[in-house]
């Protein structure tokens, strides 16, 4: 099939798929290179242009959440530093200084259209701890009800490397899951995802539409892939993470005229990463496996370990010999083999640590007696909410 015809077919599929979305809530993520004109300070002209597009969506009743990088780069400029600092304390200080300018600029750009904006700085702990996750979700929901536009960024001033999201692509995907977004738009300095590096290969073709879980995307964008690193790998990973909540992702150049409104209207610009029900389960398991902080541990006997690892079964309370830590229902915990001490899986637990202790080593028919009548929970960790780590 000729490349031109193939591209036309892909564009038609893109438009058809995009127009099937009922888009009421959108996450827009803008990276540092775009926001700061490749590190030369905040590009206010570009920011005001994106604000104009966001205002058009806002006027149509579409709720927009913005994930904005650029605090460290702006801090470097404001402090007249010759280069980006390497020491953690200096980087955190730059983030503190630059965040002021970042939020100030977004506020000024949006208020001219009558849009109130707010600042929300998050850490990995805020989203890995269930109670803080729910509190954050509640605050975001209230802001949206008030028609306030949240501007979200990682709290680089207090975050250490070991518990960083690593990039705002990931943070945007997690925000999409928090608020059940209908679309996640990642604005970048590339037109989309290509089959090869277009700078080196004139025959490289942009991928207009693909499943977020398609393995070959990692081959293209991975560390050893054709495109090298270049940031595209994290964007594809973020697309997979957004797929966990059923949210499609568009990766597209932020330099395209009216790019945000054109994407939301269903125009074929950039690369659309789609999802389906099976992809949600696969992406969810990957998200669980990537969790940095565990809220507690479930120590399991050999029989339960075999059921989980070899037969991909749910973890039943009868196989749990010990509960460690203080956690709530819905928190992510590790599952550890009692004989080897090895972590075999991580998963989202259906019981608080208090109730887990009460039902550990007990059979299902005893739950009503232990926890009260009409107890519906029968598994400690469901297999769909469990990811193997060995």
Swiss-Prot record:
Major subcellular location class:
cytoplasm
Q: Give me the residues that bind ATP, please.
A: 29, 188-189
Q: Which reaction is recorded as catalysed by this protein?
A: L-glutamate + ATP = L-glutamyl 5-phosphate + ADP
- The enzyme's E.C. designation: 2.7.2.11
Q: What are the binding positions for substrate in this chain?
A: 69, 156, 168
CDD domains from the xrefs?
Answer: AAK_G5K_ProB, PUA_G5K
Q: Classify the source by domain of life.
A: Bacteria
Return the broad EC class: transferase
Q: One GO cellular component term, please give it.
A: cytosol
| Subcellular location as annotated | Cytoplasm
User: Ribosomal protein: present as a keyword of the record?
Assistant: no
| Pathway named in the protein's UniProt entry | Amino-acid biosynthesis; L-proline biosynthesis; L-glutamate 5-semialdehyde from L-glutamate: step 1/2
- Residues making up the signal peptide according to the UniProt record: none
Q: What does this protein do?
A: Catalyzes the transfer of a phosphate group to glutamate to form L-glutamate 5-phosphate.
What name does the UniProt record give this protein?
Answer: Glutamate 5-kinase
* Originating organism: Psychrobacter cryohalolentis (strain ATCC BAA-1226 / DSM 17306 / VKM B-2378 / K5)
Q: Name the gene that codes for it.
A: proB
């Amino acid at each position: 099939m000729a490349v031109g015809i193939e591209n036309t077919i892909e564009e038609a599929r893109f438009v058809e798929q995009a127009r099937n979305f009922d888009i009421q809530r959108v996450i827009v993520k803008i990276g540092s290179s775009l926001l700061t004109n490749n590190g030369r300070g905040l590009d206010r002209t570009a920011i005001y242009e994106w604000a104009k597009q966001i205002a058009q969506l806002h006027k149509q009743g579409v709720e927009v959440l913005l994930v904005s990088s650029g605090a460290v780069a702006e801090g470097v400029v404001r402090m007249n530093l010759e280069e980006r600092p390497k020491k953690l304390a200096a980087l955190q200080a730059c983030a503190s200084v630059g965040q002021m300018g970042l939020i100030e600029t977004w506020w000024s750009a949006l208020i001219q259209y009558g849009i109130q904006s707010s600042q929300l700085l998050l850490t990995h702990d805020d989203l890995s701890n269930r109670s803080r996750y729910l509190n954050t979700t509640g605050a975001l929901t209230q802001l949206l009800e008030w028609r306030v536009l949240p501007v979200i960024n990682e709290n680089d001033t207090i975050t250490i490397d070991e518990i960083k999201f690593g990039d705002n692509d990931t943070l945007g995907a997690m925000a999409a899951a928090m608020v059940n977004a209908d679309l996640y738009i990642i604005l970048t300095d590339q037109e989309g995802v290509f089959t090869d590096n277009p700078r080196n290969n004139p025959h490289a073709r942009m991928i207009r539409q693909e499943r977020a879980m398609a393995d070959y995307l990692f081959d293209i964008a991975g560390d050893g892939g054709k495109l090298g690193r270049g940031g595209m790998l994290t964007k594809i990973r973020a697309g997979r993470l957004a797929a966990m909540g059923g949210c499609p992702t568009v990766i597209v150049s932020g330099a395209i005229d009216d790019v945000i409104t054109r994407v939301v209207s269903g125009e074929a610009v950039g690369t659309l990463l789609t999802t389906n029900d099976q992809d949600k389960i696969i992406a969810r398991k990957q998200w669980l496996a990537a969790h940095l902080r565990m809220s507690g541990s479930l120590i399991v006997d050999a029989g339960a370990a075999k059921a989980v690892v070899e037969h991909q079964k749910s973890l039943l309370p009868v196989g749990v010999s010990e509960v460690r830590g203080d956690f709530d229902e819905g928190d992510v915990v590790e599952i550890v083999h009692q004989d080897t001490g090895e972590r075999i899986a991580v998963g989202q637990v259906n019981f608080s640590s208090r109730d887990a202790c009460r039902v550990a080593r007990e059979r299902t028919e005893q739950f009503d007696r232990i926890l009260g009548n009409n107890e519906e929970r029968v598994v400690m960790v469901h297999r769909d909410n469990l990811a193997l780590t060995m």
